Amino acid sequence: MNYIGSKYKLIPFIKENIHAVASNDLSGAIFCDLFAGTGIVGRAFKKAVHKIISNDLEYYSFVLNQNYIGNIQEIPNKEELINEVNSVALKKGFIYSHYSLGGSSRQYFSETNAQKIDAMRLKIEELKFSQNIDNCAYYFLLASLLESADKVANTASVYGAFLKRLKKSAQKELLLKGADFDLSSNANEVYQQDASELIEKISGDILYLDPPYNARQYGANYHLLNTIATYTPFVPKGRTGLPSYQKSSFCSRAKILNAFENLIKKARFKYIFLSYNNEGLMGETEIGNILKKYGAYSLITKTYMRFKADNKRAHKAAHTKECLHILIK
């Protein structure tokens, strides 16, 4: 999934420095990914640590992490399940009616793919409530649908707007592919809570923080993934069909510094790592001044290519600086 703030390309940098600071052997460690997103960082440490605690405010993220982090054993008959969901007949449901030209002025998906999403989503729910699948298989199928639907979405990566014409990838027919995950012998925990509240209930060894960098709320940028995941009817509003959504204090310039310091103050973890770039709402000095109050602070930086939701959009620079702020409490 092409995701704003994804750390996929930075995983080697993050892993190298976490191991260097904490330990090369993390087999007994509890690792918390508090702003998990698609779970890419937690997935990188899943086999290396004793337990992953994964959390995000958004439900689509909860679904992805229940699969990638929460699932630790092979799903029985997963190929048969994928084939069963792939074979369902088209259905004109909520996505078709509100997010394709077949039922609205919105063109997030082709008419065929919108019907496929509706049919597949309803089939997954049917399998769950008929008790033909357990929660592990349910989240595997639902995560597979989110990943597969995202590949044929008619957007410039985020769902804040749709494209006027169907791009080539959006013209391809949706095919459900399994969202495979790493197996593990250790049970993990997955939450969908406000980070400021969850931090009071958990503890561990390594806390990895990757909060939003700017004022764009993820609930708005990825609203359609939430809509597919929850599949709860509502009245879509405006040109983009945006539902009501939760707002993070980390996307507010007026609230972020206080929210960040409260998080650090309450954290019961020895090692804290914060990923943040040089264009975020918090400045490098502001972050450093807060972290220095609570222990030994250091900073490591890396220059890398910026994320572009729209390749045609002009930017001042092609690269951005990723900062890994490190605190040992």
Where are these regions (language model features)?
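S-adenosyl-L-methionine
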Residues: M1-L34, I40-A48, V63, N71, ...
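A polyampholytic, Gly/Pro-enriched intrinsically disordered region
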Residues: E74-E84, D210, K316-I328
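Conserved proline-anchored active-site loop of SAM-dependent methyltransferases
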Residues: F31-F45, S54-Y59, K201-N221, S275
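Conserved SAM/SAH-binding loop
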Residues: Q192-E197
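Class I S-adenosyl-L-methionine-dependent methyltransferase module
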Residues: K51, L57-D182, A215, G219-R253, ...
